[in-house]
Swiss-Prot record:
The gene is KITLG. A soluble form is produced by proteolytic processing of the extracellular domain. This is Kit ligand. GO terms for molecular function: cytokine activity; growth factor activity; stem cell factor receptor binding. It is a single-pass type I membrane protein. It comes from Canis lupus familiaris (Dog).
């Protein structure tokens, strides 16, 4: 029985070792970026076109590889979005905007935490310090979207030999025209289709609970299947060994009966001799 239990435990540990790498290979920050980034289009449509958003921008971001500026930009985007969130917090008409910005802040904060928690070999410091500039909502969220896209490919985007050097021919005026590259396409969004989010705090709590539940499910399911497969192997091994165990028990019982018969016969002979 001890051998059977040892075999079952061994199967369980083997399955855990086999399945755990599958959970880890989903990416270091695989689920940091959620579908809430799709609401950027609504937010840009809601904000005045001449509204200005302050952002510390890395000079040469349009020409440098993404690994040269991604860590700095996610930090600066977090600061700017948090400031923007504070401006909408006390405006009842802007509850829908507040909810969208709040979700974007959470995404960017998670990306900042990821860049601080893991050492990416390809990520380098920006060649120049970020400069404070004012951007329209369309320009600002184009930078936001580009940073999100760059972060998704952060682990494979650049080689170690890539240089983070801004060309001397790049003028500040040319670099500041962010709207020239990658036009931001805005589908028509009717104001009546935007629903005021009067329960943003409840949604934040439910979203955080949902995210944690998904993470626990991702961890628990492989472990559960590992246990099931381990027990299945153990049961097959036990079933295979069961006939041998039954024969062993029967042999022991037969030997005990033979010994008892021999003892009785011996005592009977001794009694007859007396």
């Amino acid at each position: 029985m001890k051998k059977t239990q040892t075999w079952i435990i061994t199967c369980i540990y083997l399955q855990l070792l086999l399945f755990n790498p599958l959970v880890k290979t989903k990416g270091i920050c695989g689920k940091r970026v959620t579908d809430d980034v799709k609401d950027v289009t609504k937010l840009v449509a809601n904000l005045p076109k001449d509204y200005k958003i302050a952002l510390k921008y890395v000079p040469g971001m349009d020409v440098l590889p993404s690994h040269c500026w991604i860590s700095v930009m996610v930090e600066q985007l977090s600061v700017s979005l948090t400031d923007l969130l504070d401006k909408f917090s006390n405006i009842s008409e802007g509850l829908s905007n507040y909810s969208i910005i709040d979700k974007l802040v959470k995404i960017v904060d998670d990306l900042v935490e990821c860049t601080e928690g893991y050492s990416f070999e390809n990520v380098k410091k920006a060649p120049k310090s970020p400069e404070l500039r004012l951007f329209t909502p369309e320009e600002f969220f184009r930078i936001f979207n580009r940073s999100i896209d760059a972060f998704k490919d952060l682990e494979t985007v650049a080689s170690k030999s890539s240089e983070c050097v801004v060309s001397s021919t790049l003028s500040p005026d040319k670099d500041s025209r962010v709207s020239v590259t990658k036009p931001f396409m805005l589908p028509p969004v009717a104001a009546s289709s935007l629903r005021n989010d009067s329960s943003s705090s409840n949604r934040k709590a439910s979203n955080s609970i949902g995210d944690s539940n998904l993470q626990w499910a991702a961890m628990a399911l492989p472990a559960f299947f590992s246990l099931v497969i381990g027990f299945a192997f153990g049961a097959l091994y036990w079933k295979k060994k069961q006939p041998n165990l039954t024969r062993t028990v029967e042999n022991i019982q037969i030997n005990e009966e033979d010994n008892e018969i021999s003892m009785l016969q011996e005592k009977e002979r001794e009694f007859q001799e007396v």
